[in-house]
């Protein structure tokens, strides 16, 4: 087994999964030099951040702004030591995970189905962003946060919490963001957040499938394969002319992939709501989950900003009741 720990986020990487991998790899290597963590675990392998796919324009912008290279792509973990950030589900992790050695998991989602034969470093907190958890690990273990790392951690929080508008946002996320902003030299969090999110609103050069897959995850919902994607926009008018094209691509994806349903969240950051595009064999799950009957291709969900907290749980419950 290689003497390297590959720190990796989920498939279809977003800003939090990429930047958290970079920041946690940096932190791990600081732990390797000594300090409090050595009292708990022996660290011999050097950490290296990797990603499972191409970065989106928002992440690319953040990395360039704070002087980081895009990490290498690694999709198979067989025979490798890996640390998982921003996920703990097999469907979202590297191939060959059962033949990898998982040495750490740092996350903010529900606990997934990745298991280990021995105890590991496992930190999972109910906050809005994995970057928030990593910042706390820096503090708890007495490692100073450099300006560039502070910048990407802050960007991750603003991205994942949708500038603190997402239902997943906690007061701790806001406090941590303020502390990181001071280190990174960012004065106006809202302005910087809009600057970041605007990069994801550029969809003209994307294919319909690119839009669906930009921030997309597969789920097993009571034995049924369900996909939920999300694209965040500063204005839904930017994508209105593409709806029919996207819908047809979703139908094709559903048929070819054996899905019970594919749901695409078109989230309007400024209006604070989501137009949910739906292709499913079970249209009744929409009413069960959200209290609104599906008429046509989509349904508007006022105040819905978070896939993790406001879309996936009610869908899981609805599919379980079929």
From Swiss-Prot:
Record's keyword terms, sorted: Cytoplasm, Hydrolase, Manganese, Metal-binding
Catalytic activity: diphosphate + H2O = 2 phosphate + H(+)
Keyword Transcription regulation: no
Enzyme category, top tier: hydrolase
Cofactor note: Binds 2 manganese ions per subunit.
Coiled coil: none
Superkingdom as given in the UniProt entry: Archaea
Known cofactor(s): Mn(2+)
Gene3D superfamilies in the record: DHHA2 domain, inorganic pyrophosphatase (n-terminal core)
Binding locations of Mn(2+) 2: 16, 86, 108, 160
Chief location of this protein within or outside the cell: cytoplasm
Disulfide bridge positions per record: none
Disulfide bond in keyword set: no
Binding site for Mn(2+) 1: 10, 14, 86
Localisation: Cytoplasm
EC code: 3.6.1.1
Pfam families attached to this UniProt entry: DHH, DHHA2
GO cellular component term of the entry, any: cytoplasm
GO molecular-function terms, A-Z: inorganic diphosphate phosphatase activity; manganese ion binding
UniProt similarity note: Belongs to the PPase class C family.
HAMAP family referenced in this protein's UniProt entry, alphabetically: PPase_C
Name of the protein in its database record: Probable manganese-dependent inorganic pyrophosphatase
Gene name for this UniProt entry: ppaC
């Amino acid at each position: 087994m290689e003497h390297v720990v590959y720190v990796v986020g989920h498939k279809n990487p977003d800003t939090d999964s990429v930047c958290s991998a970079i920041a946690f790899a940096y932190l791990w290597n600081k732990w390797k030099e000594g300090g409090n963590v050595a009292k708990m675990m022996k660290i011999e392998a050097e950490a290296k951040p990797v990603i499972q796919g191409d970065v989106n324009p928002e992440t690319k912008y953040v990395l360039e702004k704070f002087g980081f290279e895009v990490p290498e792509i690694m999709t198979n973990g067989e025979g490798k030591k890996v640390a998982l950030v921003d996920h703990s589900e097999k469907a979202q992790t590297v191939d060959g995970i059962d033949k990898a050695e998982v040495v750490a998991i740092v996350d903010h989602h529900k606990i997934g189905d990745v298991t280990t034969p021995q105890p590991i470093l496992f930190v999972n907190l109910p906050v809005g962003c994995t970057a928030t958890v990593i910042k706390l690990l820096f503090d708890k273990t007495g490692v100073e946060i450099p300006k560039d790392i502070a910048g990407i951690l802050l960007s991750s929080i603003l991205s994942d919490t949708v500038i603190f508008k997402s239902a997943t946002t906690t007061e701790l996320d806001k406090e941590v963001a303020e502390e990181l902003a001071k280190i990174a030299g960012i004065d106006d969090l809202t302005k910087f957040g809009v600057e970041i999110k605007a990069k994801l609103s550029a969809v003209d050069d994307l294919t319909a499938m690119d839009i669906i897959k930009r921030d997309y995850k597969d789920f097993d919902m009571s034995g049924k394969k369900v996909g939920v994607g999300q694209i965040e926009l500063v204005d839904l008018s930017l994508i209105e002319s593409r709806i029919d094209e996207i819908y047809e691509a979703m139908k094709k994806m559903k048929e070819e992939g054996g899905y019970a349903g594919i749901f695409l969240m078109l989230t309007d950051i400024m209006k604070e709501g989501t137009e949910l595009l739906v292709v499913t064999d079970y249209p009744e799950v929409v009413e069960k989950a959200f209290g609104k009957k599906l008429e046509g291709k989509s349904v508007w969900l006022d105040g819905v900003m978070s896939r993790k907290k406001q879309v996936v749980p009610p869908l899981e419950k609805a599919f379980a009741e079929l």
